[in-house]
């Protein structure tokens, strides 16, 4: 189409078919998909994943109090997709849809402690409401596993997903330090971690690019300010 019409059309393919869900065909299917993606790499904006479709294959559905990562069969699918398509930051892979929504009326807190939102969510302390808090917990797990952004099915989800994609200043400073250092090991910007240049380079590139797209915030306590439920 690009050659025929002289336009540049970009793609966001979605991986969600049963051949990927089934363990015995998954690797062959994913390697084949990766070969096709590589032919058009400059035109692939993002690779999406179908958590709901994978769940359907096995007749399961996560509840509002569970994460897609709690569904063992689906977790394996997502893990292998990241393994094949996410090596060396080959492609941006977004997290799956969260299917629960309820319009937020107000936040439980105006500001969280500096140590942050993950502590609240993983201890199941309320922040917005049950449906949105479940989404937030899953986005935190997305980031930990290498997903960037996610497909959303309801407008109320957008600001929460985008907010949690923002990078804290400490993460950003660490990423810049790693990318600006020739090698070896250095103390992290917060004085609380080791930054090993070579092993952490891919992480630093991903964080730096995420910061360019979603901005940098002072600390985890500032995530709540980005939720802006009344706007």
Predicted feature locations:
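Expand to "…catalyze enediolate/carbanion chemistry for C-C bond making/breaking, isomerization
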Residues: 1-231
